[in-house]
Regions:
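Flexible, low-hydrophobicity surface segments
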Residues: 145-207
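Signature of N-terminal electron-transfer/Fe-S-associated modules in redox systems
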Residues: 1-155
Length: 207
């Protein structure tokens, strides 16, 4: 068995097991998304000793004695700051990739609270987003850095719903902090699973 720390607690995992499988199936940590399964998209990003790392290609034998942190394990302060910044910047659309973006942002801000735009872009190079075009995500990271750097309180947002008022998405915080459910995150007692069975003979005539 391999022993390591997960969000501050001691855990152990079988040797040779993929970290993402353990985090999602055993720990119900759904911020770690299975987007590609081959280390390309960054939706499964976690912190390993403070470094952004893709959990879908990380085997348990590589994490002995290390500290693993997911979005669920971030401090309340960090959660509030990232939730505000990503929502305020309009950086959330479908939201699937955002927890991974938050982890990459956190890894950067552990190094510096005064990053340049180029440093933000470099930090997010391992994360793919098909919705936003990255500009608003980069803005969100810079905004989060500023709040943390200046030790400012997170502004409280009140929306009256009047015409012309700037309003945030009602589901933004849930998506940023991985509290919103996607289909693969759902678990129901007695759930039946299925998958598409592809024919080995695409031109075969079935009679």
């Amino acid at each position: 068995m391999v022993k390591f720390k997960l969000n501050g607690r001691d855990v152990e995992i079988e040797e040779g097991r993929t970290l993402i499988n353990y985090l999602r199936e055993e720990c119900d940590l759904t911020s770690v998304k299975n987007g590609c399964g081959e280390g390309a998209c960054g939706a499964c990003m976690v912190l390993v000793d403070g470094k952004a790392t893709k959990a879908c290609i990380l085997k348990s034998d590589k994490i002995e004695g290390k500290e693993i942190q997911t979005v669920e394990g971030l401090s309340d302060r960090d959660k509030k700051v990232f939730a505000y910044a990503f929502s305020k910047a309009g950086a959330v659309q479908c939201g699937f990739c955002i927890p991974g973006m938050v982890i990459s942002a956190k890894a950067l801000l552990l190094k510096t609270l005064n990053p340049t735009l180029d440093e933000v872009k470099k930090a997010l190079m391992g994360n793919i987003c098909r919705c936003t075009g990255y500009v608003k995500i980069e803005k969100a990271v810079l905004m989060a850095a500023e709040i943390l750097r200046e030790n400012r309180d997170v502004p409280t947002v009140f929306c009256k719903g009047i015409v012309g008022e700037e309003m945030g998405r009602i589901d933004a915080e849930d998506k940023i902090l991985a509290e919103g459910e996607y289909v693969d995150d759902m678990k129901i007692n007695g759930m039946i699973y299925g998958f598409a069975l592809r024919s080995k003979y695409p031109r075969a005539l079935v009679k």
